[in-house]
Amino acid sequence: MSPHQTTGQESDNMTVNGENAQASSQYIQSNEEMTDTIATEKKASAAKAAKDPSRPKRKKAKRACYACQRGHLTCGDERPCQRCIKRGFQDACHDGVRKKAKYLHDAPNEALMAGVGATLYNQRNTAQNNVNASNTSPGAPQQITSPNFYNTQQSPDYNGFPQNKTELQDSTVGPDNYASQSPVSPTYQISQGLSTQGLSPSLPQSTSETPSAANPAPGQFNSTFFDPSDPALFNFDLASMNFGNHYGALEFGMLGHMATGVGDTPPSDSGAQRGSIGQNGSGTFGLTGSSFSESPSNQAPYLFSESGMNDWTQTAPVNRRSMYGSNANLVAGNMSDKPHAFAIESAPANFASPASNESPMMTTSSATFEDTTNSGAFNSRQNVPVSQQRQQPVVSTPQLKQQNLNLGSRRRHKNASSIYDSVKDPYSYTSGFHSLTAFIQRRFSPQKTLRIAKALASIRPSFIATTKTLNRDDLIFMEKCFQRTLWEYEDFINACGTPTIVCRRTGEIAAVGKEFSILTGWKKEVLLGKEPNHNVNTGGSSGLMTGSTSRGSYTPRPYSSEVYNSSATATPRTQPVFLAELLDDDSVIEFYEDFAKLAFGDSRGSVMTTCKLLKYKTKAESDILAGSNGEADAGLNGEATSNETNELNGSHTNGATTNGRGQRRWGKGEIAGEAGMNQLGFRDGKVECSYCWTVKRDVFDIPMLIVMNVSCLFLEPLRSRAMTDIN
C-alpha cells in the first residue's frame, strides 16, 4: 500500500469520528435542555399547587404506621394507611412504636397504645392473671379462712399486706394485720348490713363481708391495690382526650380531676370518696370504741386518715385515757417537740369549739389499740352504755347535698358593679374625726391626749392641702374607690388565717376577719357598728374600767347630717368602733405617732411592732371575773381552790392543766383550738400581740385605709412559765 492510500483512509476515519463526536454533543445538549425543562415545569406546578387555595391541607397524623415510620414517610390516622394500600401490604400495617421516655422504660409497649388500646390491654392482662390464678395447685390457699378475720380474696400480683396470717394475734393490732381489698372499680360496693363475729376476748366484735363481696367475680377486683393505668378508677374517657400516650392522657385527666374538685367537696365527704385506708367502702376497718364496722354511722378513721379532719362542731368530747389507756401517751410524747400553735376550723357555724385534746385528730392519733396487758382497761369500757359512748354522725347523701347547698349560698357573688350603683353620697370623714377626738378626750389623760393631738396635727395641713380642690363628685368617687378596694380585700381576709382588720383613715373599722373576732372577743357586728357596744374594758390598771362611765352610751351613735354641709340629705349611719378602742393606752399613742410618719411618707412602707389588744368584756363578765379574782386571792393566802387541788393531785390531760382561776394552761406541743384563743388575756383583759400594718392611698394620694395583720405572742409566756417550773 502506498503512503498516499494510507493517508486517505486516516482522513476518512478522522472525518467519521468528528461527525460522531458532534452528534454526541448535540444529544447531550438536548438531554440537558429537556431535563431543565422538566425541572422547571415541576417547580412551576409545585408552586402553582402550593398557592392553590382549594388544595386540601394534609392533616398531621397522631402516630405513623411501622412501614411509614421506617421510611420517614408521611402517614395518616387510618389503618391501613393509603401508602400501605398502594404498596400492597395493607395487612401488615400497624402503629409504629415510638421511643420511650426514661420514665416509661419499664412500661410494656401495649400500655403505650393510643386511645382505648391500653384499656383493652389492661383488661386482657387482668383476664390472664385470673386464668393463672385458677390454674394453680388445688392445695394452694386461695382465701384467708379464719372465723376471726375478713374473708377477702387477695390479688395475685400484689403482696403489700401479709397473706400468711390465719388468726388474730394477741399483739398490737395494726394495719399490717388486715389483707383488705382496694376498690379499683367504681362498681365496688360493700353491703351496709353486715353480720358480726367474735374477734378475741379483748376485742369481741367484728364484721364479715357478704358472699358477693368476699367472693368477687373473676376479672372484677383482681388487680393491684392501686392500678394507675385503669381509667375507670376516676371515670376518665381517654379516647376523647386526643392523647397519643395512655400515661400522658391519664396524667392530664388526673390533673383536671384535682383542679375541678378543689373547693367543691366538703371535708366530711372528701375522705369518703377516696379508696384509702380507713375510708368508707374501702374494705378496711374503722375505729369506734371496741368494734370494727363498715357502717358509715359507726366508722371512725384509722391512724391519720383524711376523714379524721371532720368538722370540729360535730365531735363529742372523748376521754383519751379511758379509750386508749396507757398507749395514749405515745403520740403525745412524739408531739412534745412540736411548736405551740392555734388551729381554727374552716367555716364554723359559731366560734365555739372544743379544746385540743377533744379534736378528732387528737383522739384518733394513737397508732395502737389495747394489747393483752391493757385488756382490762379496754374491757371496762364495754360496761358503759352505748348512748354514752362516742358516736360518729351518719354521713348520708342528703346531708352532703345540704352541706354543699349551704356552702354555695355563702359564696359572694363576684360582681363589683353594684358598688358603683349603691354609693350615692360621700363619706363624712369630718364627722369621723370629731367622734375620734371626743373619744380620745374621754378616755385618755391630758398628757396622753396631747401626744396623740400632736401626731394628728402634724398631718392635718397635708389633709387640707389635698382635699381643698375636691368637689362632691370627687368625694363620691373617693368613696367608690374605697368600697371597691374593700370588696377586693374581703376575699383576702376570708382566705388568710391571720387575724386581720381594715379601717379607714379615721380609725373606724371597715372590715374584720373571724380570726380577729375569736382572738379579741369582739363580734364583727359590734366592730362595724351594727350592734351596740357594751365593752367596759379600757385597759386600765385592773384591766377594766371602774366607775359609772359606760361605752355603750356613744357607740353606736347616729350620724348627724348637718356636720357635713355638702351631704345634708345623707342617710344617718351608725358609728363603727375605732381602732383606738381595741388597743391599750401606750399602743394607741405609738400607733398614731407611726401613722403620722407613714400617712404621707413612704407609700409602700409598713410598720411592724408589738401591741396589746383589749378583750371585749361586758359589765356582767367583769363582775364574774372580779369574783374569780377574789377566789384566786383566797388561794394565794393558803386556801387552795378545787382546780388547784386537782392540779396538785396531777389531774391533767396530756399536759394541759387548769389553774386556780379556771383558765386552761396549754402545754408545749399542743394545738389549741378556738377555746384556747379565747383564753388569751382572760385575766387582765389584754392580749400581747405583734402586728404589722400599712397605709393604702387612693387616686388622689390621700390615705384611704389601713390594713393590719395581728399575730399572738405565745412563745414568751411559754418560755417564762417554763423557767418558773424549773425554779
UniProtKB/Swiss-Prot annotation:
Record's protein name: Transcription activator of gluconeogenesis TRV_01442
Compositional bias segments (type: Polar residues): 1-32, 129-213, 267-277, 361-379, 639-661
CDD domains: GAL4
Keywords, in A-Z order: Activator, DNA-binding, Gluconeogenesis, Metal-binding, Nucleus, Transcription, Transcription regulation, Zinc
InterPro entries attached to this UniProt entry: ERT1_acuK_gluconeogen_tf, PAS_13, Zn2-C6_fun-type_DNA-bd_sf, Zn2Cys6_DnaBD
Keyword Metal-binding annotated: yes
Compositionally biased intervals (Basic and acidic residues): 39-55
GO cellular component: nucleus
Sections of the chain in a coiled coil: none
Molecular-function GO term, any one: DNA-binding transcription factor activity, RNA polymerase II-specific
Function: Transcription factor which regulates nonfermentable carbon utilization. Activator of gluconeogenetic genes.
Subcellular location: Nucleus
DNA-binding region positions on the chain: 65-93
One Pfam short name: PAS_13
